[in-house]
Amino acid sequence: MRKIVVAAIAVSLTTVSITASASADPSKDSKAQVSAAEAGITGTWYNQLGSTFIVTAGADGALTGTYESAVGNAESRYVLTGRYDSAPATDGSGTALGWTVAWKNNYRNAHSATTWSGQYVGGTEARINTQWLLTSGTTEANAWKSTLVGHDTFTKVKPSAASIDAAKKAGVNNGNPLDAVQQ
């Protein structure tokens, strides 16, 4: 009797396992979605002014990398850290993300930080659309003017010199405090 009960349980568990595997839809697998977001976000990105954003997206939602500004007096690369939605919606929405750069490296300290917040939109013309806040350390009396606001669009295609000049002439602002401090 005991062998019959054990055999019946084993058959039941096998049936449940096979049924679950057969009914799983791989296109709805959240791990597949995470991999797609990771693969899409990871890489080298350029904004409209030619600044370079090199990022790695971790499976846990972490963003790590460097940012090199093409404007102002920023020298070399600055470390960035951030987060992204590692389980993005599957309805075609963008993937929410954000990162911060403290404008201090071995060459310069601007006593400021910029945060970018936006969405990664995949596809053949992948882009990251962001809004940024640049806050500089200042006295209490000048706190009212310590934060600048702007926007950047990042693509994986480096902009041409003509495109960068057009953006500058159009008055496109940037999140580089070393440029803002000189204004």
Curated annotation (Swiss-Prot):
List of residues binding biotin: 67, 78, 116, 132, 144
Domain Avidin-like: from-to ranges: 37-159
Signal peptide range: 1-24
Disulfide bonds: none
GO cellular component: extracellular region
GO molecular function annotations of the record: biotin binding
Keyword Signal: yes
Keyword Amino-acid biosynthesis: no
Family annotation (Pfam families): Avidin
Keywords: Biotin, Secreted, Signal
InterPro entries: Avidin, Avidin-like_CS, Avidin-like_sf, Avidin/str, Avidin/Streptavidin-rel
SUPFAM superfamilies named among the record's database cross-references: Avidin/streptavidin
Motif residue range(s): Cell attachment site: 83-85
Location of this chain's protein in the cell: Secreted
Subunit structure: Homotetramer.
Purpose of the protein: The biological function of streptavidin is not known. Forms a strong non-covalent specific complex with biotin (one molecule of biotin per subunit of streptavidin).
Family: Belongs to the avidin/streptavidin family.
NCBIfam families assigned: Stavidin (NF047623)
Protein name, per record: Streptavidin-V1
The species this protein was found in: Streptomyces violaceus
